[in-house]
């Protein structure tokens, strides 16, 4: 299992000029916010909503096909909108990389179990027809990115097994400010590419 913040760093340092990230509510976004000060214009932190990452990532990729969207989702948040996986399978043109952080619980609200015994998020993603891979070490994330770069097809989903960990500080920006800054970046990106 990887520490959550280490997994985020492994993803984020691979950003390029055509990348943005969409993240879910809770500890994932708090950690992401703490390590992306210089990239915040390209980060959409979903605060206060579960199950919205995939629909937002799809909207961005369809409206701005030149943008590579790194969609980071938690296992609990993904379970709130499993239908989004079917939509992702249907409409992903290859510009979305989905990362599911799986700690098997709703960590942000007290670690209530998110999945029954014998249930695996990667099996659900695979059943939806998505190529699904599992990461338990940093090298697995690197291998996923190499595979994505070498393929013209959508690379599917990387389920990252993450360990429980104390969160970073709360996001200290208002959702309106986050949305405005991100929208501005998207508009500028469409003019320059």
Please give the residue ranges for each predicted region:
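Acidic-glycine-rich active-site phosphate/pyrophosphate-binding loop
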Residues: 20-39
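Non-catalytic terminal/interface segments that mediate subunit docking, oligomerization
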Residues: 12-16
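Generic C-terminal helix-cap and adjacent flexible tail
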Residues: 191-193
């Amino acid at each position: 299992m990887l520490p959550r913040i280490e997994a985020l760093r492994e993803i984020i340092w691979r950003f390029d000029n055509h990348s943005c990230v969409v993240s879910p509510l809770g500890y994932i976004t708090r950690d992401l916010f703490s390590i992306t000060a210089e990239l915040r214009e390209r980060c959409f932190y979903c605060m206060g909503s579960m199950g919205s990452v995939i629909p937002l990532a799809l909207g961005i990729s369809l409206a701005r096909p030149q943008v590579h969207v790194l969609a980071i989702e938690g296992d609990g948040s993904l379970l709130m909108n499993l239908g989004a996986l079917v939509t992702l399978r249907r409409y992903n043109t290859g510009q979305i990389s989905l990362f599911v952080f799986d700690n098997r619980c709703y960590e942000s609200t007290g670690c209530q179990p998110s999945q029954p015994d014998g249930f695996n998020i990667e099996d659900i993603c695979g059943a939806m027809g998505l190529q699904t891979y599992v990461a338990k070490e940093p090298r697995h994330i690197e291998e996923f990115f190499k595979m994505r770069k070498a393929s013209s097809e959508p690379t599917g989903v990387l389920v990252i097994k993450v360990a429980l960990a104390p969160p970073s500080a709360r996001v200290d920006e208002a959702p309106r400010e986050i949305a405005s800054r991100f929208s501005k970046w998207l508009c500028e990106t469409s003019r320059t590419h």
